[in-house]
UniProtKB/Swiss-Prot annotation:
It comes from Diaporthe leptostromiformis. The keyword Protein biosynthesis does not apply. Residues 1-27 form the signal peptide. It is an enzyme of class 3 (hydrolase). It comes from the Eukaryota. Peptidase S41 family protein; part of the gene cluster that mediates the biosynthesis of the phomopsins, a group of hexapeptide mycotoxins which infects lupins and causes lupinosis disease in livestock. Within the pathway, phomP1 and phomP1' are probably involved in the processing of the phomA and phomA' precursors. The pathway starts with the processing of the precursor phomA by several endopeptidases including kexin proteases as well as the cluster-specific S41 family peptidase phomP1 and the oligopeptidase phomG to produce 10 identical copies of the hexapeptide Tyr-Val-Ile-Pro-Ile-Asp. Keywords: Glycoprotein, Hydrolase, Protease, Serine protease, Signal, Virulence. Belongs to the peptidase S41A family. It holds the Pfam family PDZ_CPAF_rel. Residues 303-504 are annotated as: Peptidase S41 domain. This is Peptidase S41 family protein phomP1'. Its EC number is 3.4.-.-. The keyword Acyltransferase does not apply. The lineage of its organism: Eukaryota, Fungi, Dikarya, Ascomycota, Pezizomycotina.
C-alpha cells in the first residue's frame, strides 16, 4: 500500500473512532504521569508584559482527568489531542510530549498559504502560496487574497485554531510558522507550514473551504500519511492498531514506530520549494549544508557577506566541521573586502549550545561568555542533587557535564570554579529571588570542561582561540530572523545583542507594531523525558550503593538518611521510560507507550540576562531593531531578503525603498 492514504473513507473511519477506543484507566494514569513530569518545568508565572496567555498545566491536567471520569472523552485520540493542546498552550518549545495515537497518522493538505505585502511596508494579506508565485511574475489581475476559512475570518481561524498549538512564545513567530519556510529543506523538516500540516492533527472536517475577496471559493481536502516507520498497514480493526501503537509488547521483529523507512511518506502533491533549491550556490558550506556563506550580487552591497546557519543540531565530528566552516567563512569574507556581515538565522530552532558559543567567540574573541541559569528548587531535584553531589567528587565531577546536579561541577555565571561548597549552596532556594522557589544562579556548564578540540568553544578548555581579533565590529553585523529563532539560536542572538549587534526580522502578524527577532523558547536547558529517566535511574543506583556501603553500615544515622532519600525518590519520581526509544517491555514502568520518537521534553533551567536577574529571559520582550513584511519577491526568492535587510541595516534610509515598518527607525 502507498504510504500516502488519500481515501476519504479511511480518514472518516479514523475520525469516527473506529481506529481505537481507549481504556479509561490507562489514560487517567497518563494524565497523572504527565503531571509528575510537569513538576520539572522551570518557569513560574509570567509578568503582565508577556504577550502570550499563561496556562496552569497542573490545573489543566486535573480538568482532563475529570473529563475522563465523567465520560466526556471517548477515544485515545481525543485524549491525546487534549493533552497535546494543553502542553502547547505553555508556548514553550522545550515542553513537548509525544503521544501514541498522534504518531499513527499525520494529516496535511496541499494548499499552503502565505502572508504577502505588496511593497514590504503596507500591511500584508493572505494568499494561496501558488498565487504569491504568480504575483511575483507580475500577473496580479486574477489574484485575490484569502478572507475566510470555514466561515471564519481567515486570520482569526489561523491564529485561534492552529497557531496557538505551535509552541513559540511570541505570537508573530507562531504566525510565521503557519506558512512555508524556505530554510526547512536544509534540515529535512516539513516545508509547507503549520496551516498545511495542522501539526499532524485531524483538522476537524474532511473539507476546508477557503473564500477569497472576489467571492470565489476553494475546497481543500486533508489527507493522511502513514509513516513507513509504523510498518505495513495491515490492521483490520481499531483494537489491533491501538495495541500495536499504544501498548507495550510486540511479537514482531520491529516495534511499532521503529520499522526502517522515512518518518513520513511523500505527499501526493508538490510542496513549496525549500532548502538548496531555492537559494543561490554558496561560496562556502559545510557537508551538512547547515552553514553557508554568500556574497550579495547587488553592486551597492559588495561589501556585505551573508552567513546562513539553519540549525545547531549537531555533535561530535559535525561540531568540529561546523567550527572549521565558520572560521573559514569569516576569514574568507574578511580577506575579500567584506566589511559587513548579515547572520541569517531564519528558521533556526536551536540544538547543541556548544557550537552556538563557539560561533559567538569567533565573532567576538575578546569577549568572555556569560551564562546565567536557575532550576526550580523541588523536592525531587533536591534528592537527585544530594545523590549526585555525594557520589561525584573532584576529578569525577568533571566527567559529568549532564546532569548539572553535582555541586562540585557547577560554576558561576562568569565561569568561576569552586563557588559552591555543597549541594545546599547550589540548590538554595535563593532568598533574593522573589516569588518562586529557585536555585542560586550558575552557568550552563563549565566551558573549560566542555570545550575540546573535538567539540570546541574557541579559546576555552583545550580548544585554541580560532580567530584572535574581531573581523567585524558590532555596528557592522546584523542578525536576520523570521522570529522562529529558538533555544541555542536565542542564546546566540542574546549574546550578540549584548555586544550591540542589531536585528532585523521579517513577516509576523498583519499589524504595524514591533516584532521580536527571537520568538522561540529562551530557556536555559532542555531535558528530554528519557534524560530525566536516566538521571532518576542513576540516582537510584547511587543511593542504593551508598545505602549498602561500608561507611553506611558503620554509621546507622547515615544509613537511615540515605534510606530516607531513596524512599523519597521512589515516591516522587515518575515511572521510567525506556532509555533507548522503542525498547522492549522490560524497560517500561508505564501501561501506555508514548514518546515513540524520543521528542518529549521539559525546560529544566531558566536563562537570565544581566539587566534582569529575577525574571526568566523567556518572559522578557525584546523588539527587533527593524521589521519588514514579506514581498512576493521575498517569498519566491528568499535570498532577496538579504538585500532588503542589508539596505535597511547598513545603508540607512537614503538607499531607497528598503525601509523598516514605520513604527521604528534604524
Amino acid at each position: 500500500m502507498s504510504s500516502f492514504l488519500v481515501q476519504t473513507a479511511v480518514v472518516r473511519l479514523f475520525l469516527l473512532g473506529v481506529v481505537f477506543w481507549f481504556p479509561f484507566a490507562l489514560s487517567s494514569s497518563c494524565a497523572e504521569i504527565a503531571s509528575k513530569f510537569g513538576t520539572w518545568k522551570s518557569e513560574g508565572d509570567a509578568p503582565p508584559s508577556y504577550l502570550s496567555p499563561t496556562v496552569d498545566l497542573l490545573d489543566g491536567l486535573d480538568r482532563i482527568r475529570k473529563k475522563i471520569i465523567n465520560g466526556t472523552i471517548s477515544s485515545q485520540y481525543d485524549f491525546d489531542n487534549l493533552l497535546h493542546r494543553l502542553i502547547s498552550q505553555a508556548n514553550d518549545g522545550h515542553l513537548q510530549i509525544g503521544l501514541c495515537s498522534r504518531e499513527i497518522f499525520r494529516f496535511q493538505h496541499g494548499t499552503p498559504l502565505t502572508s504577502v505585502s505588496r511593497d514590504g511596508l503596507d500591511l500584508p494579506q493572505l494568499y494561496v502560496h501558488s498565487d504569491a508565485v504568480i504575483m511575483h511574475s507580475g500577473q496580479v489581475e486574477a489574484i485575490s487574497p484569502v478572507v475566510e476559512i470555514n466561515g471564519l475570518e481567515a486570520d482569526y481561524y489561523l491564529q485561534s485554531r492552529i497557531a496557538v498549538t505551535l509552541g513559540y512564545q511570541d505570537p508573530d513567530a507562531r504566525y510565521n510558522a503557519l506558512f512555508p519556510s524556505p530554510s526547512a529543506g536544509f534540515t529535512g523538516t516539513y516545508s509547507a507550514g503549520a496551516w498545511a500540516s495542522n501539526s499532524g492533527e485531524w483538522p476537524g472536517s474532511a473539507v476546508l473551504t477557503i473564500r477569497f475577496a472576489n467571492g470565489t471559493r476553494l475546497e481543500v481536502k486533508p489527507t493522511a500519511t502513514w509513516p513507513a516507520t509504523n510498518g505495513p498497514m495491515n490492521y483490520t480493526d481499531g483494537q489491533a492498531l491501538f495495541e500495536a501503537a499504544c501498548l507495550p509488547g510486540t511479537s514482531s521483529k520491529y516495534i511499532f514506530g521503529s520499522f526502517p523507512g522515512m518518518y513520513l511518506g511523500l505527499p501526493a502533491y508538490e510542496l513549496p520549494r525549500s532548502g538548496p533549491s531555492v537559494f543561490p550556490a554558496p561560496t562556502i558550506k559545510d557537508s551538512n549544508g547547515l552553514v553557508r556563506l554568500y556574497s550579495l550580487e547587488d553592486a551597492a552591497l559588495q561589501d556585505v557577506a551573508v552567513l546562513q546557519i539553519t540549525s545547531f543540531r549537531m555533535g561530535g565530528e559535525d561540531s568540529r566541521e561546523f567550527s572549521a566552516t565558520i572560521r573559514q567563512s569569516l576569514d574568507w569574507a574578511s580577506s575579500h573586502g567584506k566589511t559587513k556581515l548579515l547572520l541569517d538565522l531564519s528558521g533556526n530552532g536551536g540544538g547543541n549550545v556548544i557550537p552556538g558559543f563557539d560561533l559567538f567567540r569567533m565573532l567576538f574573541p575578546d569577549e568572555p561568555i556569560r551564562s546565567e541559569t536557575r532550576f526550580r528548587s523541588t523536592e525531587l531535584l533536591d534528592v537527585l542533587g544530594q545523590a549526585f553531589s555525594a557520589e561525584y567528587r573532584g576529578a569525577d565531577a568533571k566527567e559529568i557535564l549532564d546532569p548539572p546536579l553535582a555541586a562540585q561541577n557547577a560554576v558561576s555565571p562568569d565561569q568561576e570554579e569552586n563557588v559552591f561548597g555543597s549541594w545546599k549552596d547550589l540548590f538554595g532556594p535563593d532568598p533574593n529571588y522573589e516569588g518562586d522557589s529557585m536555585s542560586n544562579a550558575y552557568a550552563v556548564f563549565s566551558f573549560a570542561a566542555a570545550s575540546t578540540t573535538f567539540e570546541p568553544i574557541s579559546g576555552y578548555g583545550s580548544a585554541p582561540l580560532a580567530i584572535k581579533t574581531r573581523l567585524f565590529e558590532p555596528q557592522s553585523i546584523a542578525v536576520v530572523t523570521d522570529g522562529r529563532c529558538s533555544s541555542t539560536c536565542a542564546i546566540v542572538v542574546g549574546l550578540l545583542q549584548a555586544q550591540g549587534v542589531r536585528t532585523v526580522t521579517f513577516g509576523g502578524r498583519p499589524r504595524k507594531a514591533p516584532m521580536q527577532a527571537v520568538g522561540g523558547v529562551k530557556g536555559g536547558q532542555r531535558w528530554s523525558l528519557r534524560t530525566i529517566s536516566r538521571h532518576i535511574k542513576t540516582a537510584r543506583e547511587l543511593l542504593a550503593k551508598q545505602y549498602t556501603s561500608t561507611a553506611a553500615q558503620a554509621n546507622s544515622t547515615r544509613r537511615l538518611a540515605v534510606g530516607h532519600l531513596l524512599q523519597k525518590l521512589n515516591d516522587l519520581a515518575p515511572p521510567a521510560l525506556p532509555l533507548i526509544p522503542r525498547m522492549e517491555d522490560n524497560e517500561w514502568e508505564f501501561a501506555l507507550r508514548f514518546d515513540t520518537y524520543g521528542q518529549s521534553s521539559v525546560n529544566f533551567r531558566d536563562a537570565y540576562v544581566p539587566a534582569n536577574e529575577t525574571t526568566p529571559w523567556q518572559f522578557i520582550y525584546e523588539a527587533a531593531d527593524c521589521r519588514m513584511f514579506l514581498t512576493p519577491e521575498n517569498v519566491v526568492e528568499p535570498a532577496s531578503r538579504w538585500n532588503s535587510a542589508a539596505r535597511a541595516m547598513f545603508g540607512g534610509r537614503e538607499m531607497g525603498s528598503e525601509k523598516c515598518v514605520d513604527y521604528v527607525s534604524v
